UniProtKB/Swiss-Prot annotation:
Localization per Swiss-Prot or TrEMBL: Cytoplasm; Nucleus
Protein name, entry field: Copper homeostasis protein cutC homolog
Role of this protein: May play a role in copper homeostasis. Can bind one Cu(1+) per subunit.
Gene3D superfamilies reported for this sequence: Copper homeostasis (CutC) domain (3.20.20.380)
Top-rank taxon: Eukaryota
One GO location term (cellular component): nucleoplasm
Major location category of this protein: cytoplasm
Effect recorded for C31A: Reduces copper binding. Reduces copper binding by 75%
Tissue-specific expression: Ubiquitous.
Pfam families noted in UniProt: CutC
TM spans (from-to): none
Record-stated family: Belongs to the CutC family.
Length: 273
């Protein structure tokens, strides 16, 4: 498939899937839920995209249409979220079939990597399910997402992910944000000893990125870097909401902010280069 719309502001060779230590000393992953946000992330200097839908729910599987157009629009690697719904990470047999089908389709439409996670009812990594999904993902690299933050024993869970063959784990340190979970993130990185990438994520902004990177020793980080912009709609029916909450207006849109991505990029370069 021929790619179109490559960023004119930052032309570069395609980056490998994501071993820690990119050519510029760090790796920034931006989670996005639209083509516009994907393009903005690349323009701002992101090294990799995590493509999702439903970011307000923590990220769910995007449509294959979005994936197809994103792949036509950016040159940086696109890792695709495989999560059939919001909520917990304990999946039914039918949900598992959906996840398997989505992995196959994501590979067909050009995903550079996959992102998923699954737990047992007692808060352990679901080894059997993960092995089954990993077999379908091969040879693509796989990230275990923030289901990790819901595990019973994070240190033991990290070793489990290593044995299963995950390339990285995304975590807020089992806390409300990466800043709050910084002590555990540091311990996880020390335990990993480079065998698996421990990638901080959750509430990362220009105000706390330096502290998180310096305090953890991480060489990759995950952020959304979004801003809210007003809808272009002129006629507005403010008494109707499409979602469950009136706090989420149909007339304000959250998109990745090029300036925010550039700022985070500059902070990380200053620390790690």
């Amino acid at each position: 498939m021929k790619r179109q719309g490559a960023s004119s502001e930052r032309k570069r060779a395609r980056i490998p899937s994501g071993k820690a230590g990119a050519a510029n000393g760090f790796l920034m992953e931006v989670c996005v839920d639209s083509v516009e946000s994907a393009v903005n992330a690349e323009r701002g200097g992101a090294d990799r995209i995590e493509l999702c839908s439903g970011l307000s729910e923590g990220g769910t599987t995007p449509s294959m249409g979005v994936l197809q157009v994103v792949k036509q629009s950016v040159q940086i690697p696109v890792f695709v979220m495989i999560r059939p719904r919001g909520g917990d990470f304990l999946y039914s047999d039918r949900e598992i079939e959906v996840m398997k089908a989505d992995i196959r389709l994501a590979k067909l439409y050009g995903a550079d990597g996959l992102v998923f996670g699954a737990l047992t009812e007692d808060g352990h990594i679901d080894k059997e399910l993960c092995m089954s999904l990993m077999a379908i993902c091969r040879p693509l690299p796989v990230t275990f997402h923030r289901a990790f933050d819901m595990v019973h024993d994070p240190m033991a869970a990290l070793e489990t992910l290593l044995t299963l063959g995950f390339e990285r784990v995304l975590t807020s340190g089992c806390d409300s944000s990466a800043l709050e979970g910084l002590p555990l993130i540091k311990r996880l990185i020390e335990q990993a000893k480079g065998r698996i990438v421990v990638m901080p994520g959750g509430g990362i902004t220009d105000r706390n990125l330096q502290r998180i990177l310096e305090g953890s020793g991480a060489t990759e980080f995950h952020c959304s870097a979004r801003s809210t912009r007003d809808s272009g709609m002129k006629f507005r029916n403010s008494s109707v909401a499409m979602g469950a909450s009136l706090s989420c207006s149909e007339y304000s849109l959250k998109v990745t902010d090029v300036t925010k991505v550039r700022t985070l990029n500059a902070i990380a370069k200053n620390i790690l280069v």
